[in-house]
Amino acid sequence: MKAKSLNTFLLLLTGQFILAASLNLASASELYFIDAHSQLDHRVDDPELVIQRMDESNVYRTILAARSKRQPGEIVDMAEYHPQRIVPAVRTKSGAYNTDNPKYYKKMKKQLRDGRYKAMAEILLYHAQKGDKAPEVMVYPDDPRVKFALNVAIEHHWPFVIHIEFASLQGKQRQQFMQKMKNLLAENPNHAIVLNHLGQLRANELAPLLRQYQNLHVLTAHTNPAIITHSNQPWSNMFDGKKLSSEWKDLILQHPNQFVFALDNVWERHWREFYPEQMAYWKSALADLPSEVAHAVAHGNAERLWQLAPR
């Protein structure tokens, strides 16, 4: 009798292990992504390449903005054709913004009157020159152009995405940008401020900011070897081989609700060549995290911040 009971117990225990393993596999297979910030340059001949790449890598949605000579309305049209996949973002970049021309406000207001945008693209605060494609931009966080965009984001309940390349700043300028970013965070404690590219900060530099400012979130764009190896910019590398490095993994585990997956693809090469390899890195990295953390970073935090329905 005892032997029979023991056998029954072992069978039940084995069944539980099999069930648990099956659930874990199901959880891993169901992990999907939301790219919380990308852009589409006019040199991408076929915009459907975006959807193709998303389908290949289980990216459910992309928050997308126009770039270069591509018009913002083209992104809205694309979103209407793919309403569950593309989230159209107000375009913020322009020569008018860079030169403090009043046309910047006119361009923004025209898009806002359209009423179909669901997000706003990043605001460039410090952007180092990138060859002949992207000029240097230096606009402090307390500039009227930035305050205008912030008020738009607050009014529409959109996260405010900022771009500061701290590793490309030196001395007094770096200190000023850091202090003014802290002021921005402190003055808007109830609004999500999202720093693209981790701000080009190291893990030990970002950690105290995440602890102090609960409204600070960071995008993971351009932080993997697939893109870093093709760039001469000092991007933050979150990886050690195919997995997250220990310092970045620990920081994500400490602040799982403040990290948001993003790619920030822009150019043809980003979409056509680099996309599959970038996604391979991120799938490998998130597979090494607890399921609830992986889901938060991959899509949950973006859904919460941008008020997007889960898949």
Q: Predicted regions: what is each one?
A:
Residues K4-S5, L25, L31-I34, D45-S68, ...:
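Mid-to-C-terminal alpha-helical segments outside catalytic/metal-binding sites
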Residues A121-A128, H163, T220-T223, D264:
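Short loop/turn segments at strand-loop or loop-helix junctions that form parts
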Residues E80, Q84-I86, V90, E136-V260:
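Catalytic pocket-lining loop regions of alpha/beta-barrel enzymes
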Residues D41-V44, K69-P72, G95, Y126-Q129, ...:
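Active-site environment of divalent metal-dependent phosphoester hydrolases
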Residues L40-P47, S68, N101, V139-V146, ...:
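Solvent-exposed, acidic/flexible segments
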Residues A28-F148, V152:
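Mid-domain alpha/beta scaffold segments of enzyme catalytic cores
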Residues F9-N24:
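Bacterial N-terminal signal peptides
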Residues L49, E74, K103, K107, ...:
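Extracytoplasmic/secreted proteins, especially bacterial periplasmic and envelope-associated proteins
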